[in-house]
A protein has these predicted regions:
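Conserved polar/disulfide-associated segments of primarily extracytoplasmic proteins
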Residues: 88, 95-120, 234-317, 321-325
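Short, exposed beta-strand/loop patches in secreted or surface proteins that constitute
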Residues: 24-27, 49-53, 119-128, 151-153, ...
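Extracytoplasmic/secreted proteins, especially bacterial periplasmic and envelope-associated proteins
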Residues: 84, 96, 224, 263-264, ...
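Sec-dependent N-terminal signal peptides
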Residues: 4-15
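N-terminal targeting sequences that direct proteins away from the cytosol to non-cytosolic compartments
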Residues: 20-30, 34-36, 43, 194-244, ...
Length: 348
């Protein structure tokens, strides 16, 4: 539990940064960043992921889980793609298909479809100026998705900044379900993504009996816990294996307020290793005073459980933010919602 939660914490450090050829990125992409979409144009549940290695090398992956109703086995297709980084448009210079292409199947059509996604996303993103906000709408004609659509571009989404595509009926034909960043060359988070399955809530979740109240502190900030909690590190407290609370200081990423906000949101909404933040089930609220509130639902594939994480950033007059994160298994959170919400509200 602790390992899964700690992997969500982040560092505000740029390593190698890139941009898609011909695109002016407000937030430069970092090596290892990725995005996954649910493509609702397929008859079966289908996901498409795009990963950036550097400014000339990418990976695109298709995944469809087993469809028992239609008796369809799990399906996967991965392609490594190289591009001309100096081009003003998406100019593929090579590719390597990493998965077996079966004769007499629709594999060739699927490969062409993935090619089209890359070319089309690049061309449509190139039509936009710098995307420096969330959910920027652009009405375009897109035959691949049924004609006239609204593409929502978003600064917090890496690579092409495409968040959702909505058709003329108001239906999402394609939607971002998670973003993330690989932590090392050994990180299999991108290749291991298999969607957000329906998981059984932990049957052993029990109502928590509040213990003796105690106030804990870190770096001048306090939160009210009780004797059920154990301090693991200077700034970390655990409630058995069910919950983990962390306090920290988050530095300002940039003096440009808008860039700072978008960058922090991208980092705090990024999945890490085998823990995937479910975008459609998560929210972020940036207040006028600069405070930020995140309510995130994530799926941890290692434990096959959903996790609810509340994150609060309180802006400091001296610069930076005081940060609180409370992560709880979903079953425990639902049974003890008022207990955990009270803890979050006590952050001062």
């Amino acid at each position: 539990m602790k390992k899964s939660f700690l992997s969500i914490l982040f560092a505000f450090t740029f390593f190698s940064v890139f941009a898609v050829p011909g695109v002016k990125q407000f937030i430069p992409d970092a090596s290892g960043e990725y995005v996954y979409y649910k493509d609702n144009t397929f008859k079966r549940e289908s996901y498409i992921g795009i990963l950036v290695y550097d400014d000339a090398n990418y990976k695109i992956r298709y995944f469809a889980p087993t469809d028992e109703a239609s008796k369809l086995p799990e399906k996967e297709m991965s392609i490594l793609v190289s591009v001309n980084k100096d081009s003003a448009f998406w100019d593929m210079t090579g590719e390597y298909i990493m998965t077996q292409v079966l004769p007499g199947t629709e594999d060739a059509d699927l490969i062409n479809y993935l090619h089209d996604i890359l070319y089309e996303f690049s061309a449509r993103r190139n039509k936009m100026e710098v995307v420096d906000a969330m959910n920027v709408p652009s009405t375009q004609d897109y035959a691949q998705f049924g004609g006239s659509v609204t593409i929502f571009f978003d600064a917090i989404i890496p690579i092409f900044n495409v968040r959702d595509i909505v058709d003329s009926k108001g239906e999402k034909v394609l939607e971002c379900v998670c973003i993330g960043k690989l932590t090392s060359s050994e990180d299999k988070g991108f290749d291991s993504f298999k969607g957000f399955p329906q998981v059984a809530e932990n049957d052993d979740a029990q109502k928590i009996k509040a213990g003796k109240s105690m106030k804990v502190s870190y770096d001048g900030k306090t939160v009210k816990l009780d004797s059920n909690w154990t301090q693991s590190l200077e700034n970390i407290w655990t409630l058995g294996d069910e919950a983990l609370l962390t306090m920290a200081f988050v530095p300002v990423a940039s003096e440009n307020e808008n860039f700072n906000n978008m960058y922090i949101v991208r980092k705090l909404m990024s999945s890490s290793q085998t823990s995937y933040i479910n975008f459609p089930e998560s929210t972020v609220n940036i207040k006028k005073n600069g405070d930020m509130i995140f309510n995130c639902e994530s799926y941890d594939s290692a434990s096959n459980k959903n996790i609810i994480t509340n994150k609060i950033l309180k802006k400091k007059k001296s610069g930076g933010y005081d940060f609180l994160s409370l992560a709880v298994y979903q079953g425990d959170y639902k049974i003890n919602k008022s207990y955990f919400d009270k803890i979050v509200k006590s952050f001062k």
